[in-house]
Amino acid sequence: MADRRRRRRRAFQDSEEEEDEESGSESAGSGGQPAAPSRQESREPGTKRAEPPREGKESECESEDGIEGDAVLSDYESAESEEEEAHLSEEEPLKTTLKQENNVEEAPATREQKPKSKGAVTGERQSGDGQESTEPEENKTSKKSQKQLDDDEDRKNPAYIPRKGLFFEHDLRGHVNDEEVRPKGRHPRKLWKDEGRWEHDRFREDEQAPKSREELISIYGYDIRSSKNSEEIRPRRPRKPRFGSPTRREEISEKPSRPSNRYQDSGISQPLRPYTNRNAPPSNKVGPSRTYSRQGGYKENRSSYQSEEEAPPHPSERRQDYGGHRARSTEQGPAPPREFSPEADPIIKEEPVIEKQAAEPSPPPPDRPVEKKSYSRVRRSRIKVGDTGKSMEDTTVTELPPPPPVPPAVAAEFTPAPLNVKQGNWEPPSEGGMSGIEEELSQMNLSEQSWNPGQPAYISPRGIPNPMHMGGGPPQYNRMEGMAVQGGRVKRYSTQRQRPVPDPAAMHISLMESHYYDPLQFQGPIYAHGDSPSSMPPQGMIVQPEMHLSHPGIHPHQPPATISTPNLYPAPVSLPPGQPPPQQLLPPPYFTAPPNVMNFGNPTYPYPPGALPPPPAHLYPNAQAQSQVYGGVTYYNPVQQQVQPKPSPPRRTSQPVTIKPPPPEENRHVKMKEKSNS
């Protein structure tokens, strides 16, 4: 590149010298110029020979001087300009040799011209003397000034913008129209055709008509407009029960072969469902259990089903749907007491009718779950004492093993009346009003005002047959938790918290026999009647072995049985009030004085080691009620005691979080200063 520039500079200087000589000869003004034609002829062919290559290759970038010399290629040139360079490099030696010849010829011509120029007439010009240029001298100089370039076109200027080559085809600086910049013949190729671009989405008139049934079946596989298979097409209720209960799966699998609901209305026994995990639901209980699965599912609001079920299913069934099939097993429990009492058979048949009577003064047990609104509350309140009583009343008869054989000594003391009375009343009678269980429980009211969840479960809920009544068998449930958990539900910590008990009339006391007396479960003080009865919760109670204590409320016509082992009751040992009882002894339970004396105080009679405490009385805080003492146990008549149900505390109103506006700016700055100072 440097050699090429040097050569061009030399050629440029030579051409300048030629012009100077021409102007000098012209100013001499010689009239006859014999040598001029020859010199001009010799020069003209040279210029003519040298000019064609110049014209053929116009300069790529014009220099400041305006001379159309060969372009000095910039470093930014692309492959196109490199091809042009090859041509230029071939033509350059030719140009230089021609210019040198011209210089050699011009030198003698000028020498000859000088002496002869004196005789030439000024202002007269010879034709063909080589001076007849079409433009006057002024125009030549003005042409130089016209070629004055802008800063961005001048290569010597730092603001020069190279515009040649592929790299600069989009450089639009200083250009008004694109045609100058865009290289010709370079059009962007189309990558796709736009002709049929929107054919798939075009509006076609012939497609707007409704399709025929065959077309619908070919497209969708079935006729989406037909109302015959409306079971598959009708929109489902979006709200499904949580934890997809097995009832949902049964419903889907049994749909084709499911019999209609007329069994429920007519009372005809329907074939049993083939499930093994149920408690063998009898024929007449299938009706209610089927209505709940409809109720819990998504078909509740359809008119076709409303005609079949005139009465809506009971809320207890809706609750059970969320709990799954485990809750249903407790409802179906009452059915099989046929093994126990054949006379209960007609009573059960009308039980679905009883369930639907909502306006009874004292509703039967299945009506109580009306208050359960949500699944989580069902889970929590399932362990409540009243609820365990209800569910246990349904299940225990079927699940309890038959009582073990009674020893003859005990059998002699037992009268068959309690057994029959208890068994006949397991099922509520078909008539409205109070059932047998409710009447029995109203006599055996247990106050639950100071109920402690940590107590051992020696107080069984209602409906559980007393082991004392059933004959000397072991207690069927050792723990209240065992009864509550029997539904297959995991016992949670939240179920052990103290909650308001719904109905205080739901409990009576199951008096355990001391064969199964566990001293570890009698650690706390036993409830005693005193001035502040609610201060000590009931801890449990025991009955001495082989003795039958008849409750005056249940069997008022029986004489009290004799105590067969009176030597277990030791004489009371009196201690000074300040002296603590011996360490190994139990805390002092309620000890009654001799049978004809009432003892309402807080006694401090510890027992000597090895002695068992006598059973305390029924746990009633009302000490003024009439009471009877049988065999060292004080019984109170519950009918004369008004037990006030403990009102549940009102729900705490959720108060919104108050959002205070930020303090004003000046106070904030003051506080910041105080903090920084401190």
UniProtKB/Swiss-Prot annotation:
<comment type="function">
    <text>Required for pre-mRNA splicing as component of the spliceosome. Core component of the splicing-dependent multiprotein exon junction complex (EJC) deposited at splice junctions on mRNAs. The EJC is a dynamic structure consisting of core proteins and several peripheral nuclear and cytoplasmic associated factors that join the complex only transiently either during EJC assembly or during subsequent mRNA metabolism.</text>
</comment>
<dbReference type="GO" id="GO:0030425">
    <property type="term" value="C:dendrite"/>
</dbReference>
<dbReference type="GO" id="GO:0000398">
    <property type="term" value="P:mRNA splicing, via spliceosome"/>
</dbReference>
<feature type="region of interest" description="Disordered">
    <location>
        <begin position="1"/>
        <end position="412"/>
    </location>
</feature>
<keyword id="KW-0866">Nonsense-mediated mRNA decay</keyword>
<keyword id="KW-0747">Spliceosome</keyword>
<feature type="compositionally biased region" description="Basic residues">
    <location>
        <begin position="1"/>
        <end position="10"/>
    </location>
</feature>
<dbReference type="GO" id="GO:0010494">
    <property type="term" value="C:cytoplasmic stress granule"/>
</dbReference>
<dbReference type="GO" id="GO:0005634">
    <property type="term" value="C:nucleus"/>
</dbReference>
<feature type="compositionally biased region" description="Basic and acidic residues">
    <location>
        <begin position="247"/>
        <end position="257"/>
    </location>
</feature>
<dbReference type="GO" id="GO:0006417">
    <property type="term" value="P:regulation of translation"/>
</dbReference>
<feature type="region of interest" description="Disordered">
    <location>
        <begin position="637"/>
        <end position="678"/>
    </location>
</feature>
<feature type="compositionally biased region" description="Basic and acidic residues">
    <location>
        <begin position="311"/>
        <end position="324"/>
    </location>
</feature>
<dbReference type="GO" id="GO:0000184">
    <property type="term" value="P:nuclear-transcribed mRNA catabolic process, nonsense-mediated decay"/>
</dbReference>
<dbReference type="GO" id="GO:0035145">
    <property type="term" value="C:exon-exon junction complex"/>
</dbReference>
<dbReference type="GO" id="GO:0051028">
    <property type="term" value="P:mRNA transport"/>
</dbReference>
<feature type="compositionally biased region" description="Polar residues">
    <location>
        <begin position="124"/>
        <end position="133"/>
    </location>
</feature>
<keyword id="KW-0507">mRNA processing</keyword>
<feature type="compositionally biased region" description="Acidic residues">
    <location>
        <begin position="14"/>
        <end position="24"/>
    </location>
</feature>
<dbReference type="GO" id="GO:0016607">
    <property type="term" value="C:nuclear speck"/>
</dbReference>
<dbReference type="GO" id="GO:0071006">
    <property type="term" value="C:U2-type catalytic step 1 spliceosome"/>
</dbReference>
<dbReference type="GO" id="GO:0003729">
    <property type="term" value="F:mRNA binding"/>
</dbReference>
<feature type="compositionally biased region" description="Basic and acidic residues">
    <location>
        <begin position="663"/>
        <end position="678"/>
    </location>
</feature>
<dbReference type="InterPro" id="IPR028544">
    <property type="entry name" value="CASC3"/>
</dbReference>
<feature type="compositionally biased region" description="Basic and acidic residues">
    <location>
        <begin position="166"/>
        <end position="183"/>
    </location>
</feature>
<feature type="compositionally biased region" description="Basic and acidic residues">
    <location>
        <begin position="225"/>
        <end position="235"/>
    </location>
</feature>
<keyword id="KW-0810">Translation regulation</keyword>
<feature type="compositionally biased region" description="Polar residues">
    <location>
        <begin position="258"/>
        <end position="269"/>
    </location>
</feature>
<comment type="subunit">
    <text>Identified in the spliceosome C complex. Component of the mRNA splicing-dependent exon junction complex (EJC), which contains at least casc3, eif4a3, magoh, nxf1 and rbm8a. Forms homooligomers.</text>
</comment>
<keyword id="KW-0508">mRNA splicing</keyword>
<feature type="compositionally biased region" description="Basic and acidic residues">
    <location>
        <begin position="346"/>
        <end position="358"/>
    </location>
</feature>
<protein>
    <recommendedName>
        <fullName>Protein CASC3</fullName>
    </recommendedName>
</protein>
<comment type="similarity">
    <text>Belongs to the CASC3 family.</text>
</comment>
<keyword id="KW-0966">Cell projection</keyword>
<keyword id="KW-0963">Cytoplasm</keyword>
<keyword id="KW-0539">Nucleus</keyword>
<feature type="compositionally biased region" description="Basic and acidic residues">
    <location>
        <begin position="384"/>
        <end position="393"/>
    </location>
</feature>
<dbReference type="GO" id="GO:0048471">
    <property type="term" value="C:perinuclear region of cytoplasm"/>
</dbReference>
<dbReference type="InterPro" id="IPR018545">
    <property type="entry name" value="Btz_dom"/>
</dbReference>
<feature type="compositionally biased region" description="Low complexity">
    <location>
        <begin position="25"/>
        <end position="38"/>
    </location>
</feature>
<feature type="compositionally biased region" description="Basic and acidic residues">
    <location>
        <begin position="40"/>
        <end position="60"/>
    </location>
</feature>
<keyword id="KW-0694">RNA-binding</keyword>
